Amino acid sequence: MLYPKEFDVIVVGGGHAGTEAALAAARMGCQTLLLSHNIETLGQMSCNPSIGGIGKGHLVKEVDAMGGAMAAATDEAGIQFRILNSSKGPAVRATRAQADRVLYRKAIRTRLENQPNLMLFQQAVDDLMVEGDRVVGARTQVGIDFRARAVVLTAGTFLDGKIHVGLDNYTGGRAGDPAAVSLSARLKELKLPQGRLKTGTPPRIDGRTIDFSVMEEQPGDLDPVPVFSFLGRPEQHPQQLPCWITHTNSRTHDVIRGGLDRSPMYTGVIEGVGPRYCPSIEDKIHRFASKESHQIFLEPEGLTTNEFYPNGISTSLPFDVQLELVHSIRGLENAHILRPGYAIEYDYFDPRGLKSSLESKAIEGLFFAGQINGTTGYEEAAAQGLLAGINAGCYVRERDAWTPRRDQAYLGVLVDDLITRGVTEPYRMFTSRAEFRLSLREDNADMRLTEIGRELGVVDDVRWDAFNRKRDAVSRETERLKSTWVNPTLLPEADAVPLLGKGIEREYSLADLLRRPEVRYEALVALQDGRFAPETPLADDTMLAEQIREQIEIGIKYHGYIARQAAEVDKLEANESTKLPPNFDYTEVRGLGFEVSQKLNQHRPETLGQASRISGVTPAAISLLLVHLKKKGMGRAAAQTSATPVAGNGQEAA
């Protein structure tokens, strides 16, 4: 049957990508439908009970800056918060939280059910409705047709998913949930390029059977307790709990080696490639054979359960081997396994078949987000979901898509990596992937993205007002520090030495003094009983005031480095803004070479910058392409822009 109401946007899947996509489209005013096989598992944390980390926390902050749900839900569900790399520079500091699974799911469900313009419906999707080269809706397993102008597909690991425990396997999207077999078959009929990937999860342990007395306690940060959302407050956090650390040992490693003959990974049963940066314990023992032990973090799953997640021993070994493996670890000698670990293979679709908006190049109005694009991790999925939801809304409203640049957001780095380089293994975000990471910090995600989010319609009045107060205060106080001058008379040696280590010999601005590594803003404005403090407080709200102080201090201390990075961005901007014709035949470019023209014809980059990052496309090839475009007058940007070739792989254009 045809459902009587037509929607603007349909989102298929209710995981981290799907929920952010649905919320974003609805915030833009689009009539949105979220279809899930089970609305009880919306926002489910299928693997580890944590959010954030290096690179990942940056993505969560960016999602939050644009009104997304993940950070706020984590503040309500987080049972431990830590700032990683706190002793290092601000570019690589990252927030990480342990979350209560039940509270997190509840926080997401509450937002979904109370979001205007958003409706939920429980049914598995078996088919996409496609007319010509355009998607027009989705069909459920009982034959209900829902029509929409745009569809966002966020199927996670469910597409033809196969779960492995030892040499036994069965179809499933995750433990306890069915696989999306029919939908996977339908997508293959559409001739979209696809492959198989694999991920895994460890056995879960009953905390009542763990001997914590022989383990190292790992508490969270308590003074102060961090928050994830820019609007978050520590008072929102539930009770805080510690994690615990133990290690594998030589006996553990012997058990694992003895079970490799029944490992689906080492007997060829699993064909999909697993995540490099979250390897199974089998992989660790095999790849790092000389390492005597590996760290294991025992992470609580929540406040109302005894279940623990042993982070570090993801495995698909047979259950009897898993049991012996767990019992070989100190503190787990008598542990009871509540759920076996397993690996899951699933279909993904080559993200090089997507535009930078995450819309399919082959099927108009169809957007992909999350693990279906070859990524791994809740945070990467949520960020893609936000972008796909926004651009589905832009598509419906006939507005230009929003495509964040690499210098603008980690989300821009993520999407650009996916669509230009593709994936051969599950992709996860690290700060090292960003060339401009000094400008892409957690602390300034709102300064980079909230105004854009407001223009797109995804940032509400509460966030916008808080952001404006912060931005105005940062600007006002930074200018005051630059224009307030002190000399040896105003700042005598007795006052200067505790702050600077020596007296000042000439006139300095307060900004000059703050630029010194050892000087903190709080100490500077506290000099001489607050003589150099602003006339009014930075903000009435203590959390907002702390954010303002942080922005002021980082902005002044790192001004020179940030300015140099901005100059590098300007040099590359010409390439990024030079559009390439969508149906251009690259074999027409003389001297380009067969391999390069073949790759460009295959991947269809949207800009010269994207073309430069495709494997095998050299700076010489980019120069030839630019000359050809100018000569033919193809595209206003190409005709008017003097683009700068960027570094390639050193090969010549043949």
UniProtKB/Swiss-Prot annotation:
Residues engaged in binding NAD(+): 274-288
Subcellular location: Cytoplasm
Record Pfam families: GIDA, GIDA_C_1st, SAM_GIDA_C
One biological process term in Gene Ontology: tRNA wobble uridine modification
Gene3D superfamilies: FAD/NAD(P)-binding domain, GidA associated domain, C-terminal subdomain, tRNA uridine 5-carboxymethylaminomethyl modification enzyme MnmG/GidA
Subunit relationships: Homodimer. Heterotetramer of two MnmE and two MnmG subunits.
Protein name: tRNA uridine 5-carboxymethylaminomethyl modification enzyme MnmG
Organism expressing this protein natively: Cupriavidus metallidurans (strain ATCC 43123 / DSM 2839 / NBRC 102507 / CH34)
Lineage: Bacteria, Pseudomonadati, Pseudomonadota, Betaproteobacteria, Burkholderiales
Gene it is expressed from: mnmG
